[in-house]
Structures are given as structure tokens and as C-alpha cells.
Amino acid sequence: MSSGDFGNPLRKFKLVFLGEQSVGKTSLITRFMYDSFDNTYQATIGIDFLSKTMYLEDRTVRLQLWDTAGQERFRSLIPSYIRDSTVAVVVYDITNTNSFHQTSKWIDDVRTERGSDVIIMLVGNKTDLSDKRQVSTEEGERKAKELNVMFIETSAKAGYNVKQLFRRVAAALPGMDSTENKPSEDMQEVVLKDSPNETKDPEGGCAC
């Protein structure tokens, strides 16, 4: 047990990343963890796990990031990972209309397992490909409002809004009520630092 476990336990929160194949789930995690992007696409096999410490104003939390495979053959594994998650990050590709439509199914899956006791963030990724955009920002905002979930657009490749995504999620975590209701533009005041001891599950899938 580390010294940080005495008196002031490090609160851990599980974030599960969901969405169709190749929408950029792994790339968002890689950008957040290592501030890097791999142009070579490799599908995640099964489930991958990483964790990162975030320093949020007067408290520290440990985010456990679960990266799920988008392929149909791994779908049966996913409900068990949703079941005890605090946050579900549902990702679609703004250049792929089908991936956007499928987010309704993913969100339904989350609510089937977790009811309303979960934070859901809808993420439109790949804004760097705006010339190929098939899903407008307004469509994403409208769906998020209809389904009562949070919304943000990102580019894992360019790094656009990736830290902001995690800041907003962290500010909405249980016990963060003092920041949960702040306007989104104020979320930038949440301090994000890299942990000196980031960990990766040695049995995880690919990290690209």
C-alpha cells in the first residue's frame, strides 16, 4: 500500500470507451495518456486498460480507462465492463454517419447496465477531417440533448479538445459537485497534470 493510501485514499473512477470500430477510441486515450498519435491503425483486441492520475483543484483522482473493441465479435464482453463504470465515453466518427447512428445503441446498452447512475459523454471525433464531415456539430448537440448526455467534438490526431474532454468528465464525477454545474468554458480552470507513475495493463491489447 502506498503512502497516499493512508488517511486520504485515492478515489478511483472507471471510464469505459465505447463505439464502432475505427472511430478513434484508442487514439483518444493515447493522446490523453502520452500526448501522441499513431497514424497506423490497429484494431483493439478485446479490452485494453490504462490508468492515469488527475489533479483536480483540491483533490486527486485515479481514472481507470477501459478501451473496448468495436468489432462485433467482442460485443459480448462489453456489458460486464459497463456494469461497474462511473463514466461511459461513447465515440463516433464525424465522417461516418453510421457510427453516429450507432451511438444510440451504445447509450442504450449503458443505461441497460447502469440505469441513470452513470455519466455519459458523447464524443464526435476526427474534427481534423472537417472536409469529409458527414455529421454536423448541431446534429451531435441535438442528439446529446435528446438523450440527456454530455457532448464534445475532438480530434485525437490534432489533440483538439482531448484534455477538455477529460476535464469535463472529471468535473462531473461524484464528489465534484462544486465544479459540476460550472459553465463549460470555466472547465479550463481545472488543473490537469501528468502522473509520474502511469500504468498499463501488461495483458492489454494494442496501444495504438
Swiss-Prot record:
Positions of GTP binding: 19-27, 67-71, 125-128, 155-157
Tissue-specific expression: Expressed in larval eye, wing and leg imaginal disks and in salivary gland. Expressed in the larval optic lobe, showing an enrichment in the neuropil. In the adult brain, expressed in photoreceptors and mushroom body.
MF term (GO), any: GTPase activity
Positions of short motif Effector region: 41-49
InterPro entries: P-loop_NTPase (IPR027417), Rab (IPR050227), Small_GTP-bd (IPR005225), Small_GTPase (IPR001806)
Keywords: Actin-binding, ER-Golgi transport, Golgi apparatus, GTP-binding, Membrane, Nucleotide-binding, Synapse, Transport
Keyword match Transport: yes
Presence of keyword Nuclease: no
Any single Gene Ontology cellular-component annotation: cytosol
Cellular compartments annotated: Golgi apparatus membrane; Synapse; Perikaryon
Phenotype seen when the gene is deleted: Larval lethal.
Entry function: Protein transport. Regulator of membrane traffic from the Golgi apparatus towards the endoplasmic reticulum (ER). Mediates membrane trafficking during egg chamber growth and organization, possibly upstream of exocyst component Sec5. Also during oogenesis, plays a role, together with BicD but independently of Sec5, in the polarization of the oocyte microtubule cytoskeleton, in the localization of oskar mRNA and in the anterodorsal secretion of grk. Required for anterograde opsin transport through the ER-Golgi complex.
Record-linked PANTHER family: RAS-RELATED PROTEIN RAB (PTHR47977)
Cross-referenced NCBIfam families: small_GTP (TIGR00231)
Protein name: Ras-related protein Rab6
Source species: Drosophila melanogaster
Source lineage: Eukaryota, Metazoa, Ecdysozoa, Arthropoda, Hexapoda
